Amino acid sequence: MALTRLLIKDFRNIESADLALASGFNFLVGPNGSGKTSVLEAIYTLGHGRAFRSLQAGRVIRHECAEFVLHGRVDANERESSVGLSKSRQGDTKVRIDGTDGHKVAELAQLLPMQLITPEGFTLLNGGPKFRRAFLDWGCFHNEPGFFMAWSNLKRLLKQRNAALRQVSRYTQIRAWDQEIIPLAERISEWRAAYSDAIAADISATCALFLPEFALSFSFQRGWDKESDYGELLERQFVRDRALTYTAVGPHKADFRIRADGTPVEDLLSRGQLKLLMCALRLAQGEFLTRQSGRRCLYLLDDFASELDTGRRRLLAERLKATQAQVFVSAVSAEQVADMVGEKGKMFRVEHGKIEVQPQD
């Protein structure tokens, strides 16, 4: 799967751009603040309905413009599709697929599986459990057709339960919510556990290449004691939940814990090693998707050279090439990505929001 063409209008500092893209590596080179990351963010937004640097649509719409518009041509298994997304300052979102309106953002995410590697991506390792839940949920979303609807319903029900906790005095008054929550919670936890077990070998193998000096271990924590029945636990903890005014246990508290030599990775690894581990996790997840479904991810790498020495950059470049996936890489100079440049690559020069193809020597 590859994005063959990208049109950007009034997104960040980019007034207008129409890019014919390479199926392999696409390099975005230019000084800091030129708009390189904005191109990556436009691609990410086209596949997620939101930017990765801001959750507020108004902040990514170009100054004094009413909306941004993104459009792409997607080549998926020799079938070409068109996808489009626009967002106004009022928050109105329009999704178009193959010329028809009324589609959901989740459909874009299904069409355009992406792995994002940014300097802020360390939160996967040193941020809270929600970032590692998101890692598992990306895999469940792309591997389990019923996951998205189940998780959306569970989040809605938990929100309603938490609101009810502020008003009720007896457990019987919220039992109706729990009767709907329990089967969803158990199903989602089973999907997450199955996915973490299935991908464990891929993660271990990739991490062994990137960080052979450490013995890494991974464990899924479902969000409540594995020996406890979730329904009974919700009833037992009602008084506590009512005092807290939120549901303290469940899939929304799950985690995917990562240790190196028995120690949490954020307490042991350097920033360069953490970046390698983050890259290994993203690569392993993308390769697992390809093996399971035949679909390839898009890989988006922002500020590629930061935290990595020449040898580590070369190793990452080799592993990315081996995926045969489409890759977008931003860097300050062409020299930083010299190890990645090949016959299927394309170099773009970005300055002041203007993007031009740069001939390769």
From Swiss-Prot:
One of its GO terms (biological process) is DNA replication. One of its GO terms (molecular function) is single-stranded DNA binding. Keywords: ATP-binding, Cytoplasm, DNA damage, DNA repair, DNA replication, DNA-binding, Nucleotide-binding, SOS response. Its main location: cytoplasm. Disulfide bonds: none annotated. ATP binds at G30, P31, N32, G33, S34, G35, K36, T37. GO terms for cellular component: cytoplasm. It is found in: Cytoplasm. HAMAP family: RecF. The RecF protein is involved in DNA metabolism; it is required for DNA replication and normal SOS inducibility. RecF binds preferentially to single-stranded, linear DNA. It also seems to bind ATP. Belongs to the RecF family. This is DNA replication and repair protein RecF.
